[in-house]
Design a protein with these regions (language model features):
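Catalytic Walker B motif of ABC-type/P-loop ATPase nucleotide-binding domains
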Residues: 167-170
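Conserved ABC transporter NBD signature motif
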Residues: 64-72
């Protein structure tokens, strides 16, 4: 299959707690392909968020490597790491982590401005995305005035600004009611088709997982693919 590839290769993650080794991931190897969508399921506290942080390069594994198109993320130069985090992947978390003092439009523009794009270009792209997530009428509102579901849609628009090859979403519906969560899932699927990107979603919700092409279960440190 053509397209970008994100791979965890022999990845382990453990912590020392009171002198005891606590294993989160045990020698895990999985290849994720652009154009496919994946769910990572597991109970709360099993290590899904840790795995997502490792995949995104925000956290280092205890052993093994994370590779993007064959390049080890931890070995990227600072400028290459910035491009990876700001352009190659998009990140959405359970909490939106928006800049509360800024407007909806200004929040969505941030990745473009960080990439050196002009203010006019960023404004046009942000407005286009806000139409797609049905928040164009809120573009001048402070994000602090929005509901949780609306804030998550702003976070999704921001994550998609630079048309990433992969979108990583860590429990994106975890703090939302069913109907709002369903809308977020529909948007994820819509954008996955439109952009042809890979999507990796961590969740404990089967409704979310069932919308993805493949489902993995994280249990006892192992990532196991559910049979089709």
């Amino acid at each position: 299959m053509n397209g970008a590839k994100l791979c965890i290769q022999g990845v382990e993650k453990f912590f020392l707690h009171a002198g005891t080794r606590v294993e989160i991931l045990k020698k895990t190897t999985v290849l994720f392909q652009q154009g496919m969508s994946y769910a990572i399921m597991g109970a709360s506290g099993v290590g899904k968020s840790t795995l997502m942080h490792i995949l995104s390069g925000l956290e280092l594994p205890s052993a093994g490597s994370v590779l993007f198109n064959g390049h080890t993320i931890s070995e990227l130069a600072a400028d290459e790491k910035f491009v990876f985090l700001n352009q190659s992947i998009g990140l959405v978390f359970q909490q939106p982590y928006l800049i509360r003092e800024l407007s909806v439009l200004e929040n969505v523009m941030v990745p473009g401005l960080l990439s050196g794009q002009s203010s006019a270009e960023c404004k046009d792209r942000a407005q286009e995305l806000l139409v797609q997530v049905d928040l164009a009428s809120k573009r001048t509102s402070k994000v602090s005035t929005l509901s949780g579901g609306q804030q998550q849609r702003v976070a999704l628009a921001r994550a998609l600004f630079n048309r990433p090859q992969f979108l990583l979403a860590d429990e994106p519906t975890g703090s939302l009611d069913f109907n709002t969560g369903k809308l977020i899932v529909e948007l994820l699927c819509k954008f996955q088709q439109e952009y042809g990107m890979g999507i990796i979603v961590s969740t404990h919700d089967m409704h979310v997982a069932s919308a993805m092409n493949q489902i993995y279960y994280l249990e006892d440190g192992y990532l196991v693919l559910q049979p089709a």
